[in-house]
Design a protein with these regions (language model features):
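Structural detector of well-ordered beta-strand residues that form the stable sheet scaffold
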Residues: 71-72, 99, 152, 184
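A contiguous pocket-lining binding segment that forms or flanks enzyme active sites
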Residues: 114-158
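PRPP-dependent phosphoribosyltransferase catalytic core
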Residues: 2-10, 14, 143, 147-219
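Short, glycine/charge-rich flexible loops or terminal/linker lids adjacent to PRPP-binding catalytic cores
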Residues: 83-124, 138, 203-206
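Active-site-facing substrate-recognition patch
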Residues: 1-65
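Short glycine-rich phosphate-binding loop at a beta-alpha junction
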Residues: 65-75
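Gly/Ser/Thr-rich loops at beta-strand to alpha-helix junctions
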Residues: 75-81
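Active-site catalytic pocket residues across diverse enzymes, especially alpha/beta-hydrolases
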Residues: 63, 89, 93, 148
Length: 219
């Protein structure tokens, strides 16, 4: 793992954003997971700065190969992520535009459903916390298309590398195949397992590996 990924994991663990529990956490899918990541707890200036810095490093990581003009944050959770991350990118010497959508289309003033930079004719990367079913991302993809943007990638905080209820592939893999674009995450389940192997007890690692064996994507 790269230093920014290790820092991100440590901050998440230290602030109970990444949690582990022997009895597990019930997910929306109904599965009982030994870990839970709650990005909504990056809710202070310091923590949001650390989160956006991790996103920025992931964007600039050559291995992720992002090429874009505008960072798009889907309403509502993606809005602060887009704004904070372009600030972090600027601090690291890369100046990019940001944009986000309104849930309710404005019919006065400048009107429209987009706030921030125009998407027309520009390469766009979507930023979000996680991809569960992919529904919210698909809605964002349609907004970008209608606004004349060209979607080139998606970045999320965590890839659970977990099969959906409908298939043996993950939501991220499905989006990659469906949209034929670059989809990346700051960290993956594999990264979490490697991190816990060095920082937490053997029992936690065994629970994570058992969960991955049961629900993880193959290959």
């Amino acid at each position: 793992m790269r230093p920014y990924q290790l820092d991100f994991l440590q901050v998440s663990l230290d602030n109970d954003i990444l949690k582990f529990r022997n009895e597990g956490f019930v997910l929306k899918s109904g599965r009982l997971s030994p870990y839970f990541f709650n990005a909504g707890l990056f809710n202070t200036g310091r923590l949001l700065s650390q989160l956006s810095t991790a996103y920025a490093h992931a964007i600039l990581d050559p291995a992720n190969a992002f090429d874009f003009d505008v960072l798009f944050g889907p309403a509502y959770k993606g809005i602060p992520l887009a704004v904070a991350t372009v600030q972090a990118l600027a601090t690291l010497g890369t100046d990019k535009e940001y944009s986000f959508n309104r849930k309710e289309i404005k019919d006065h003033g400048e009107g429209g459903s987009i706030v921030g930079a125009s998407l027309k004719g520009k390469k766009v990367v979507i930023i979000d916390d996680v991809i569960t079913s992919g529904k919210a991302i698909r809605e964002a993809v349609e907004i970008i298309r209608l606004e004349g943007g060209v979607l080139t990638g998606i970045l999320v905080a965590v890839d659970r590398q977990e099969q959906t209820l409908e298939s043996t592939t993950s939501a991220i893999e499905s989006l990659k195949d469906e949209l034929n674009i670059n989809v990346q995450a700051i960290i993956t389940l594999q990264d979490i397992i490697e991190f816990t192997r060095k920082t937490l007890g053997k029992e936690t690692v065994q629970q994570l590996e058992a969960y991955r064996k049961q629900y993880g994507v193959k290959g």
